[in-house]
Amino acid sequence: VGKLIDHGVLPASIAWIDPEFTAGDLGAKWRAVPSNTSVKLFINYLTGADSFRFAHAPHFALNDLAPTDTCLLGDVADPLVWITGQLCAQVSALRTRATGLALHGGRWEVQTELGEITSKNVILAVGSVPKKLAYPWLNEIPIEVALDPAKLAEQPLEGATVAVFGASHSSMIALPNLLAGPAAKVINFYRGPLRYAVDMGEWTLFDDTGLKGEAARWARENIDGVLPDRLQRCLVDSPEFPELLESCDYAVYTVGFSPRPIPAAPQWGQLECNAANGIIAPGLFGVGIAFPEYRIDPTGFGEYRVGLQKFMDRLNKTLPLWLKYGS
């Protein structure tokens, strides 16, 4: 929304649809989670659009943190909520959900819970949801609970054995959180070796798939170093996997995220987003964690770019194209 305004789109012609306007899942679910992004990059994002008016923002805790440090996502959510308020005051903010899309007469018809609106262009930033595995006999601890020490402390885990699936940033936060509680045992089921991000100066090796910050530090000491008491690791392809899985009472799935379904578009069937430029259809575009950019690094390794500043970088490159590739 901010970048559209910065590119000269009249605020009065922008309809922003969101059920809450509280900085999405980041503001609602992930505030207690340590980031894998430096404070400096968050500040770059917050100051990256004139329409954000961040120069006029009140003082936030984020302003007091060292630029090269990581932080809690809650430190970022607070200024994002403030910016949301600034943008909502400029555009038509509709507190609802989009449920359907159709293209007629060169304009997109967007069905919402409040009725229909039409537009020449539609940008989807629908977000993603955690993936799950099919072990229904295990009591699931939602990932947003496992990553929040206060919420996790409310779980009745005394004497329990907890399975943690995955070896991601989220995994390396959930594991120490669980080990700090009363669980009798924690078993980490994994598929391969850990991957760490390495700053190479002008680029970062494994920038989007490697461990960073506190998660990387903990993993080096406790996974690739000396396993803590009560923590066991098991390769999912090993013969021990079925028996160890059967011994578990609870499960935490830290195995990635899937894009939320986009509004139904029976006219087109299954729509796909071009990972190179964000185009879904003429006048229909995708941005954010549900539609990340795919980039190949100098070594030839490719990964999807996920992070607020990376979404901003993507918009800076693609928005001029989108504004010409209308319906």
Question: Where are the language model's segments positioned?
Answer:
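Dinucleotide-binding Rossmann-like beta1-alpha1 core, especially the glycine-rich loop
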Residues: 31-82
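Flavin (primarily FAD) cofactor-binding/catalytic cores of flavoenzymes
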Residues: 2-21, 62-327
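Conserved N-terminal glycine-rich FAD pyrophosphate-binding loop of Rossmann-like flavoproteins
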Residues: 19-47, 197-209
